[in-house]
């Protein structure tokens, strides 16, 4: 029997306590799995009533970290000391910064190009490699959360206009 598996390594999931946490992450089985690199979705569970805000906070934190890393990549790309290979990897990363899967591939190339560089900026980028790729932020919850107790948060997140998914 074939089972559905969710294995997107760019997927960040905020889950409300309730029915979605039962089908979404109960022992001894889970719908989430890893890819060939051992990477899979990041799943977190919040209180029932604040899940929209929790997921939105995850998105804002990711955006802040990526903004700082983007500035570091721009500095490396502009450095006279950077090799042409490093500059090309930096440019590919910057060109695909908002493009999901393409940015994940560019992030891998960037880390490979910077691995072994001695400057503090390159070391920081490599150290934070898990935050380089654009993430796909999801907020999961049931009808009691979305239509009742958590509605104000859902409304706030949707009104933000951010690239976020609610299910």
Put a short name on every predicted segment.
Residues 1, 115, 119-126, 132-137:
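Gly/Pro-rich turn-and-neighbor structural signature
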Residues 2-6:
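Short, small-residue-biased leader/transition segments that mark boundaries at the very start
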Residues 7, 129-133, 138, 157-159:
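Solvent-exposed alpha-helices and their adjacent loops that cap or buttress functional pockets
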Residues 11-15, 135-149, 164-167:
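A short, small-residue-rich loop immediately preceding and capping a beta-strand
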Residues 22-56, 130, 148-167:
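Catalytic or ion-translocation cores adjacent to nucleophile or general acid/base/metal-coordination motifs
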Residues 47-121:
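N-terminal leader/propeptide and maturation segments of large enzyme subunits in energy/redox metabolism
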Residues 110-117, 132, 163-166:
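Core nucleotidyl-transferase/polymerase catalytic module
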């Amino acid at each position: 029997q074939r089972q559905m598996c969710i294995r997107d390594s760019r997927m960040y999931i905020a889950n409300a306590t309730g029915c979605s946490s039962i089908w979404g992450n109960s022992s001894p089985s889970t719908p989430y799995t890893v890819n060939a690199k051992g990477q899979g979705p990041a799943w977190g569970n919040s209180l029932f009533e604040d899940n929209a805000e929790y997921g939105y906070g995850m998105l804002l934190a990711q955006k802040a970290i990526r903004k700082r890393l983007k500035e570091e990549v721009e500095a490396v790309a502009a450095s006279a000391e950077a090799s042409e290979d490093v500059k090309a990897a930096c440019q590919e990363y910057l060109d695909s910064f908002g493009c999901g899967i393409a940015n994940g591939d560019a992030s891998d190339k960037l880390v490979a190009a910077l691995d072994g560089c001695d400057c503090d900026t390159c070391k920081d980028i490599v150290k934070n490699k898990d935050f380089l790729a654009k993430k796909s932020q999801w907020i999961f919850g049931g009808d009691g959360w979305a239509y009742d107790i958590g509605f104000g948060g859902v409304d706030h997140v949707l009104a933000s206009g951010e690239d976020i998914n609610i299910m």
